[in-house]
C-alpha cells in the first residue's frame, strides 16, 4: 500500500489507540501496508506507543548539564520523573551526548534533529529511552553562550558525575587580557557565585522593569501603611529599591568569595591586575525543575500508580 492510500481516518484511529504521534502513526501504517494490528505492534516495537502513554506524566527530576568548547558554552536540562533515573548511567550517558551535540546545534529545534552515535536523531533517542528506562523523559530546554574573546566559566552544583547535576551555570567574560588562566579562574568563581546567589540580571538596566515596579509598589504601600509623610516615603522606597538591586543584580551583589566587595568591585580589581577591561557578556543559570508544576499525590495514589505500572 502506497503512502497516498493511507487515510487520515486510519491515522487518527491509530493515534487514539496508541497515543503515538500523527507522523509516527502514518509511518507505521505505511510500513505495515495499512494493517491496523501490525501497525500497533510496529509502534510498540519502536517504543513509541509506550512512550506516548508515559508522556502524559510530569517529568520534573533529571539533570542539567554544562558544556564548554572554547568560546562557546551550552546549558541543557533533560527531565525524568524520578531522581532514581537521574542516577541511572544510561540516562547520564544520554544527557552527556546531547550536551556535546548542543554546543554545535545552537538551538533546541536543530538539536532534536542531530544524529547521535546510535544513528537516531536526538528526539528519537529520547523517545527510545522512555521505553527502555520506563519513565517520561523530556529534553526541556537549552541556552547558548558565545563570546568573541575572553573566557567562559562553568560550574555544576550537586554533581552526580562531572558536568551533570542539579544546577548548571555558565558565565562569559569578554576581555583581551593576556593572562587567560586568571581570567578563567575569575569566570569560574563568578559562575559559583551565580549558582549560590541566583541573580536575576547582570545590571539594573537589564533587570525586568515590571519586576522593579512591582517591588516599588509593594514598598510604597507598606511605607504608607506605616503612616510616614510623603517626602519620607519617597526616600524610603528608593532606599529599599537600592537594597533590592543589591540582592538580585549580579554586579551589585556581595561577592561570594569576598563578601566585603561587590561583584563589580571584584571585576574592577581584576581589570587593574590584568591590565585589560573585563565585561560580563552573559550568564546562564539552570536549576533543575524550576518553573515546572510538580504533581501532588497522596500515599494511596502513589501505591496505586506503582501497582498499575
Swiss-Prot record:
It comes from the Bacteria. It is found in: Cytoplasm. Keywords: Cytoplasm, Elongation factor, Protein biosynthesis. One of its GO terms (molecular function) is translation elongation factor activity. Residues 82-85 are annotated as: Involved in Mg(2+) ion dislocation from EF-Tu. SUPFAM superfamilies: Elongation factor Ts (EF-Ts), dimerisation domain, UBA-like. One of its GO terms (cellular component) is cytoplasm. The keyword Repressor does not apply. Belongs to the EF-Ts family. PANTHER family: ELONGATION FACTOR TS, ELONGATION FACTOR TS, MITOCHONDRIAL. Associates with the EF-Tu.GDP complex and induces the exchange of GDP to GTP. It remains bound to the aminoacyl-tRNA.EF-Tu.GTP complex up to the GTP hydrolysis stage on the ribosome. This is Elongation factor Ts. It comes from Rickettsia rickettsii (strain Sheila Smith).
Amino acid at each position: 500500500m502506497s503512502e497516498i492510500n493511507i487515510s487520515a481516518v486510519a491515522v487518527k484511529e491509530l493515534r487514539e489507540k496508541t497515543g503515538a504521534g500523527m507522523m509516527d502513526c502514518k509511518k507505521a501504517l505505511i510500513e505495515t501496508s495499512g494493517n491496523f494490528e501490525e501497525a500497533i505492534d510496529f509502534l510498540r516495537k519502536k517504543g513509541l506507543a509506550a512512550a506516548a502513554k508515559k508522556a502524559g506524566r510530569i517529568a520534573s527530576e533529571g539533570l542539567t548539564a554544562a558544556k564548554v568548547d572554547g568560546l562557546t558554552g551550552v546549558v541543557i536540562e533533560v527531565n525524568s520523573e524520578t531522581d532514581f533515573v537521574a542516577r541511572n548511567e544510561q540516562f547520564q550517558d544520554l544527557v552527556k551526548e546531547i550536551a556535546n551535540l548542543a554546543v554545535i546545534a545552537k538551538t533546541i529545534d536543530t538539536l532534536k534533529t542531530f544524529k547521535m552515535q546510535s544513528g537516531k536523531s536526538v528526539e528519537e533517542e529520547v523517545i527510545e529511552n522512555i521505553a527502555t528506562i520506563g519513565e517520561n523523559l523530556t529534553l526541556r530546554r537549552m541556552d547558548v553562550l558565545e563570546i568573541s574573546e575572553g573566557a567562559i566559566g562553568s560550574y555544576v552544583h550537586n554533581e552526580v558525575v562531572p558536568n551533570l547535576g542539579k544546577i548548571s551555570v555558565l558565565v562569559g567574560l569578554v576581555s583581551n587580557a593576556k593572562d587567560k588562566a586568571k581570567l578563567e579562574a575569575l569566570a569560574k568563581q563568578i559562575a559559583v557565585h551565580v549558582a549560590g546567589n541566583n541573580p536575576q540580571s547582570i545590571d539594573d538596566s537589564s533587570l525586568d522593569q515590571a519586576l522593579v515596579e512591582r517591588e516599588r509598589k509593594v514598598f510604597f504601600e507598606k511605607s504608607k501603611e506605616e503612616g510616614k509623610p510623603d517626602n519620607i516615603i519617597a526616600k524610603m522606597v528608593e532606599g529599599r529599591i537600592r537594597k533590592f538591586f543589591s540582592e538580585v543584580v549580579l554586579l551589585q551583589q556581595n561577592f561570594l568569595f569576598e563578601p566585603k566587595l561587590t561583584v563589580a568591585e571584584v571585576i574592577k580589581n581584576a581589570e587593574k591586575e590584568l591590565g585589560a577591561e573585563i565585561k560580563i557578556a552573559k550568564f546562564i543559570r539552570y536549576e533543575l525543575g524550576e518553573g515546572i508544576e510538580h504533581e501532588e499525590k497522596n500515599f494511596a495514589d502513589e501505591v496505586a500508580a506503582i501497582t498499575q505500572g
